[in-house]
A protein has these predicted regions:
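Transmembrane alpha-helices of Major Facilitator/SLC transporters
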Residues: 89-91, 317-341, 351, 355, ...
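A membrane-interface helix-boundary motif in multi-pass transporters
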Residues: 195-215, 425-447
Length: 472
């Protein structure tokens, strides 16, 4: 049967539950972010411009040299930008997570949203006042000092975990990712068209950046005045968890199913508790290695599509970014199906293989249609990180969600900073010889990330014993 929080049309009480949904904040924020990301790339490209470009241009070598110089300038800009964006949250993100756990869950959501709004305003002012491109670093710093994406997403994951039962948590968190993906898809699809609204005008990009600021403002106001913190879904049980320390297996998507299960075994011994810590560590390692591959690929793709052999224009750039967000939809469908039959570790490995295969094909892309085929192969690429978060949430106390999630997110952010710098330098060194080098490296790292997850799966299998779980 549908419950109030699932069926909001069933009366005034469910209407209160609607205010606990984090999805409107995620959607507004992601539309603003997708518009901002496209606008940032196109504004920076225009700032280092070499004149108008056409798709698949066959220009003489002097123009090719200018385009290479433009690529290096854009790449160097993003190296500094990602360094600022990645390092400044270290000053505030964990503190916001601690305040969120101790005082109010909305702290780690509202403060980062303020930073997002300020950075969007900086881009808008750059377009309006023709500021130097270096002023965009200030916008990145403001975002980071307010916690950045690390604090924001950890807050979103904490609220999502609190509002879901353990048996439904992977699905709940992937639904949030689905909303993020749909919003990003919509924003990216229109970004190129919005950027061209004032083509040839000195304020090109004004409409795009203004829309980004508007969406960021809506997200902040909603989180301040409408959003309510949900009550924890945790219920007292007559028995301990299904199998202490394991990463759950979903035989059903019924959120109450886990409450119907009982265990006829004593509390876990100290060795089991230590194994739980080892599993958390292995999940961290797997997440970090996989994130290295993903971040490196995501950072290089915008540069890759602007250069030959693709040489995309503004609208094509928007469509290409939108194709990346379709992964959120396919990953959601993947979790919806796989969670009925597979353990979390199996789903994680499926996602890693999916991304690794797509990245390998991306290394050899020569035409636009090949790019979209490679992106289609990555259809389950989002499953690993989201499922790892869900798996970790089952091994920690609810009161520690904020700190653990922000620690994971900060770890991913730090590795992302290193990866961004490394990949951009590798791209600059190899773009004239083999432009797909970075993608081949990402494929290797993604396959490598399967190893720690496989160890987790092996440890789980050694714990499972016949008769451990009995139905009431």
């Amino acid at each position: 049967m549908c419950q109030g929080s699932i069926c909001p049309w069933r009366g005034p009480l469910p209407l209160l539950h609607v205010r606990t949904w984090i999805e409107p904040v995620v959607a507004s924020t992601q539309v603003a972010t997708s518009l901002y990301d496209a606008g940032l790339l196109l504004v920076v490209k225009a700032s280092f411009g070499v004149g108008p470009s056409s798709n698949h241009s066959s220009s003489p070598s002097p123009r090719g040299a200018l385009e290479d110089e433009q690529q290096r300038a854009i790449s160097n800009f993003y190296i500094v930008y990602h360094l600022v964006m990645g390092l400044t949250p270290l000053l505030s993100a964990y503190g916001l997570g601690w305040l969120s756990d101790r005082y109010h869950r909305k702290v780690s959501i509202c403060v980062p949203l303020l930073g997002f709004l300020l950075s969007r305003l900086v881009l808008l002012l750059k377009v309006l006042l023709d500021w130097p491109v270096e002023m965009l670093y200030a916008g990145a710093a403001l975002t980071g000092l307010c916690g950045g994406f690390s604090a924001f997403w950890s807050g979103v994951m904490a609220l999502g975990s609190l509002s879901s039962s353990e048996g439904r948590r992977s699905l709940r968190l992937i639904v949030i990712d689905l909303i993020l993906g749909l919003a990003g898809f919509c924003g990216s699809m229109v970004s190129g068209h919005l950027f061209k609204q004032m083509v040839g005008h000195s304020k090109q990009g004004l409409v795009l950046t203004a829309c980004s600021v508007s969406c960021a403002t809506c997200a902040l106001l909603y989180s301040l005045f409408v959003l309510k913190v949900p009550e924890s879904k945790a219920k007292p049980r007559k028995a301990v968890d299904i199998v202490p320390g394991t990463v759950g297996r979903y035989d059903t998507l019924d959120p109450d199913q886990t409450d119907k299960q009982s265990v006829v075994r004593p509390p876990p011994p100290p060795a089991m508790a230590k194994s739980k810590q080892i599993i958390i560590g292995l999940l961290f390692v797997g997440a970090i290695i996989y994130d290295l591959a993903v971040v490196g690929t995501v950072d290089v793709i915008p540069l890759f599509v602007l250069r030959e052999p693709l040489s995309w224009n503004q609208v094509q750039v928007g469509y290409g970014m939108a194709s990346g967000y379709t992964i959120f939809i396919t990953s959601f469908l993947g979790v919806l199906v796989f969670s009925r039959y597979f353990q979390d570790t199996t789903m994680i490995m499926i996602g890693m293989v999916s991304f690794a295969s797509g990245a390998l094909l991306l290394a050899f892309v020569k035409e636009t249609y090949m790019f979209y085929i490679a992106r289609a192969i990555m259809l389950f690429a989002l499953i690993p990180i989201t499922t790892i978060r869900s798996a970790m949430s089952k091994l920690i106390k609810g009161s520690s969600y904020g700190k653990v999630f922000v620690t994971l997110q900060l770890s991913l952010t730090l590795t992302g900073v290193v990866t961004s710098t490394l990949y951009n330098k590798i791209y600059q060194l190899t773009m004239e010889k083999f432009i797909g080098t970075c993608f081949a490296l990402s494929s290797f790292l993604s396959f490598l990330a399967i190893l720690p997850i496989g160890i987790v799966a092996y440890k789980q299998a050694s714990w499972l014993q016949p008769g451990d779980i009995t139905e009431k």
